[in-house]
């Protein structure tokens, strides 16, 4: 099939590469979000998908809005058979959805209808799920509600960050998306409606969502930190300054409890923080305006008092 691939961040690259290398399909163009300012210099930066498309000599469409008449006209001229999508990052209006013969087919990183929305992996880690997966479905105007062509499952490991899990799903999902493209071309694959029960939403994590509540149990603190890694990053405050947190882990067995948020002086190189249950070990921090550093080095420089705590 002649394909127009839509995607923006690095998580879309395994799928784009798989389709570019497929002997059965031809990616004739990509759709991605426009270049945007990034970094300290605020220089314009292309999306990872655009960078790969430029390397391969593909036509790039980067409309500010998918309803842009010039974009719709060009897409109509290309007349793709299908438009596979991975993390494009914008809603697609009905006029765009109607152009490809076989529609727009999206790789979504959850077992639909669970975790519809922008942050399915982060929300699954935050909720303490032990299993998730990916679904390939036909896009409809409603959010992530279209009929499903295929799914895969993936176990969530106890130490998985959202980044770890998303990396695995992106690779496995690329194989699934390619198989779905094959099945659509063969006419052997039928999309099935999503169940009406089990629907849940996965909105993007806000800055306030990832502020650590030290009065929560240690397991909840651990899930929050892992869910927010690598972005937006879990955080707390100390002496009225924001501190981003690296990974946490359970304190050694038998360690006495600490008041919620209380910092214990480094003990055998370990920085301990109190929660509602057992303390957690904090390995790395990123103080406001500074680079990441070992938590033990940071706390030695601050020398917190016995009554000081994260807030």
Curated annotation (Swiss-Prot):
Assigned keywords, A-Z: Protein biosynthesis, Transferase
Family: Belongs to the Fmt family.
PANTHER family: METHIONYL-TRNA FORMYLTRANSFERASE, METHIONYL-TRNA FORMYLTRANSFERASE, MITOCHONDRIAL
Residues binding (6S)-5,6,7,8-tetrahydrofolate: 110-113
Keyword Transferase: yes
Biological role: Attaches a formyl group to the free amino group of methionyl-tRNA(fMet). The formyl group appears to play a dual role in the initiator identity of N-formylmethionyl-tRNA by promoting its recognition by IF2 and preventing the misappropriation of this tRNA by the elongation apparatus.
Record field: catalytic activity: L-methionyl-tRNA(fMet) + (6R)-10-formyltetrahydrofolate = N-formyl-L-methionyl-tRNA(fMet) + (6S)-5,6,7,8-tetrahydrofolate + H(+)
GO MF annotation: an example: methionyl-tRNA formyltransferase activity
Residues covered by region (Disordered): 33-52
Gene Ontology cellular component terms for the protein in this record: cytosol
Annotated SUPFAM superfamilies: FMT C-terminal domain-like, Formyltransferase
Enzyme Commission number(s) from the entry: 2.1.2.9
Protein name as catalogued: Methionyl-tRNA formyltransferase
Presence of keyword Ribonucleoprotein: no
InterPro entries registered for this protein in UniProt: Fmt, Formyl_trans_C, Formyl_transf_N, Formyl_transf_N_sf, Formyl_transferase-like_C_sf, Met-tRNA-FMT_C, Met-tRNA-FMT_N
């Amino acid at each position: 099939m002649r394909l127009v691939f839509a995607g923006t961040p690095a998580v879309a690259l395994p799928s784009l590469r798989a389709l570019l290398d497929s002997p059965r399909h031809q990616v004739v163009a990509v759709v991605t979000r426009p270049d945007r300012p990034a970094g300290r210099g605020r220089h314009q930066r292309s999306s990872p998908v655009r960078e790969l498309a430029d390397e391969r000599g593909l036509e790039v469409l980067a409309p500010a809005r998918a309803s842009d008449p010039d974009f719709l006209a060009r897409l109509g001229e290309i007349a793709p058979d299908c438009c596979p999508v991975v993390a494009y990052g914008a809603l697609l209006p009905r006029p765009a959805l109607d152009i490809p013969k076989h529609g727009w087919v999206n790789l979504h990183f959850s077992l639909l209808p669970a975790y519809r929305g922008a942050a399915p992996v982060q929300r699954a880690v935050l909720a303490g799920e032990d299993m998730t997966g990916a679904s390939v479905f036909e896009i409809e105007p409603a959010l992530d509600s279209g009929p499903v062509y295929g799914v895969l499952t993936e176990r969530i490991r106890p130490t998985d960050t959202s980044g770890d899990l998303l990396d695995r799903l992106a690779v496995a999902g690329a194989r699934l998306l390619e198989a779905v493209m094959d099945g659509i071309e063969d006419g052997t694959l039928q999309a099935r409606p999503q169940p009406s029960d089990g629907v849940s939403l996965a909105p993007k994590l806000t800055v306030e969502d990832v502020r650590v509540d030290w009065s929560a149990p240690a397991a909840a603190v651990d899930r929050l930190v892992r869910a927010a890694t690598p972005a937006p990053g879990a955080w707390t405050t100390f002496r009225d300054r924001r501190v981003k947190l690296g990974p946490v882990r359970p304190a050694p067995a038998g360690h006495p409890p600490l008041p919620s948020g209380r910092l214990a002086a480094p003990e055998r190189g370990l920085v301990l923080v109190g929660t509602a249950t057992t303390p957690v070990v904090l390995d790395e921090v990123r103080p406001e305006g500074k680079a990441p550093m070992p938590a033990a080095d940071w706390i030695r420089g601050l020398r917190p008092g016995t009554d000081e705590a994260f807030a």
